């Protein structure tokens, strides 16, 4: 009888551990933390606290999908992060530092099984004279061509002015049905204005993509 009870206990502990590993980080509460739109699911999240430039996969990806980023222009490293858009259970830690000369940063984030996706992240430039102060946001639904349709229709903009203090940036792709349930969805951030020098950088932290499960 005691052996049977021990066996059952071990099974329950193992099952609980597996469920915990599959659960997404909860949205935080308090200053600077993330508040997902009602009904949204966190799909991908990068906090860069592991400081591993070779690990391009998201710190969290919804089970069954994998988010990755790619930056090939210059080199990247890490520095002190931001408390904007934090996910509960993490701290400001480190952020991704994209160094000049910079071109673009691409986040591949399949939306298979989801729609109404929203991208949110914190960013700052290293100074007003070095480090890109203008970012242009485009996205692809076919894995080849990058467009701005969902961001610029109805008078919207796909450009962001970047300051020297971390700001929060949000881009909503819900108006383009081709983004929904799309394994080829990716977002490109193209740098301009003070991005061609040999010094300076832009810093990204707490990047999240949320969506509604279909």
Q: Model-derived features: where do they sit?
A:
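Bacterial Sec-dependent N-terminal signal peptides
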Residues: 5, 15-42
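Short edge beta-strand/loop segments characteristic of extracellular beta-sandwich folds
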Residues: 108, 120-124
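Extended, low-complexity, turn-rich repeat/linker tracts enriched in Gly/Pro/Ser/Thr and Asp/Glu
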Residues: 112-115, 124-132
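Sec-dependent signal peptide recognition
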Residues: 2-8
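GGW-centered surface loops in extracellular recognition modules
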Residues: 37-57
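Surface-exposed, low-complexity/disordered Ser/Thr/Gly/Pro/Asn-rich loops and linkers
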Residues: 65-116, 201-203
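Conserved Ser/Thr-centered positions that define the repeating blades of beta-propeller domains
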Residues: 137-141
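Terminal, low-complexity interaction segments
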Residues: 48, 146-214
């Amino acid at each position: 009888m005691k052996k049977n009870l021990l066996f059952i206990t071990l099974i329950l502990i193992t099952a609980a551990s597996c469920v915990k590993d599959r659960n997404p980080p909860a949205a935080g509460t308090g200053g600077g933390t993330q508040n997902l739109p009602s009904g949204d699911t966190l799909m991908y999240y990068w906090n860069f606290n592991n400081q591993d430039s070779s690990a391009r996969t998201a710190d969290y990806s919804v089970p069954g999908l994998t988010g990755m980023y790619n930056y090939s222009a210059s080199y990247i490293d890490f520095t002190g992060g931001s408390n904007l858009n934090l996910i509960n259970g993490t701290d400001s830690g480190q952020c991704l530092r994209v160094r000049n000369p910079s071109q673009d940063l691409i986040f591949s984030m399949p939306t298979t099984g989801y729609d109404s996706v929203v991208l949110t992240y914190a960013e700052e430039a290293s100074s007003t004279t070095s480090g890109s102060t203008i970012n242009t946001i485009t996205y692809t639904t076919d894995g080849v061509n990058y467009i701005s349709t969902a961001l610029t229709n109805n008078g919207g903009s796909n450009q962001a002015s970047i300051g020297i203090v971390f700001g929060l940036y949000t881009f909503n792709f819900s108006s383009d049905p081709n983004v929904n349930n799309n394994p080829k969805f990716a977002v490109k951030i193209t740098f301009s204005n003070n991005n061609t020098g040999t010094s300076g950088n832009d810093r990204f932290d707490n990047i999240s993509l949320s969506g509604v499960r279909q």
